[in-house]
Structures are given as C-alpha cells and as structure tokens.
Amino acid sequence: MTNLKYIAILIFALVLPMGIGSAQPNPEVSQDVRNVAVQKILEGRSGVVAVYARGLCCPSCAIGVRRMVSALDFVDTEKPEKGVVIDPVNQLVTVEVKAGKTVDPKAIRKAIQDAGYAPVHIYTVVAKKLVTQSIE
C-alpha cells in the first residue's frame, strides 16, 4: 500500500506541472504584428472594419464582445459568426458592416467597453492603405 501511495504522488508531481499554464491567455502582440494581421484581414474586403481591443486575449472571455457588438444596428449578423469575428491572438474584433450602413465608432467603443475590454483603434482600408483611428 505504501508503494502505491508513493507511485500516486510521483505521478501527480510529474503530471501537475504539465497542466499549469495551459489555459493562459495569449500575450500582448506588438503594434507592428497587429498591423500586419489587420492588413491581411481587411485586404480586398469592403464593408469590414477591425478594432484593437486591449485585453482581448482569451477566446471564451470574448463571447461577450461578440454578443454586444453583434447587437449594433450596422453589423451584418447574416454573415458567419453573427458578423463579428474575434482574434484573441492579435486582440482584434473584425466587424462585417451591413450594405448601405456606416460604422459608428462610438457605438463600437461602447459595446466593447460594456463587454469589459478597452477599445483602442479602429482600422479600415482606404485605397489599399491601412487607416488607423483612435477610439479610446
């Protein structure tokens, strides 16, 4: 019985460190990395904006962001993921805009804040150039 107890403790001691940190959120990426990601997301697409939401680094925590942003009247909820795609690696929220509607940066800022995150920038592409606007 004593040997069995030692074996169980040894197995527990070896397996426990493997699970530590497995549910860690993604670390903050640099603005340069985020700009490249935004350019890839928005390239060749119209009616789409991206928002940098500081702290948005866990996919399950971001569910509230999708719920809050998709409730905005200019979001095309007929698109996949209710028109709101979450990228926790780059801390980006991509929003599909309904045809004929315009984006309201103040409404996006409030929706993301209400979900518990800090919106920093809104990105669009105009004439193949990335345009960044502060929404803090």
Where in the sequence are the language-model features?
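Short, low-order "capping/linker" segments at domain edges
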Residues: 129-136
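Short glycine-/aliphatic-rich beta-strand segments at the starts of folded cytosolic domains
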Residues: 43-55
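Short amphipathic alpha-helices in soluble, non-transmembrane regions
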Residues: 65, 106-114
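Conserved redox-active cysteine motifs that mediate thiol-disulfide chemistry
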Residues: 56-67
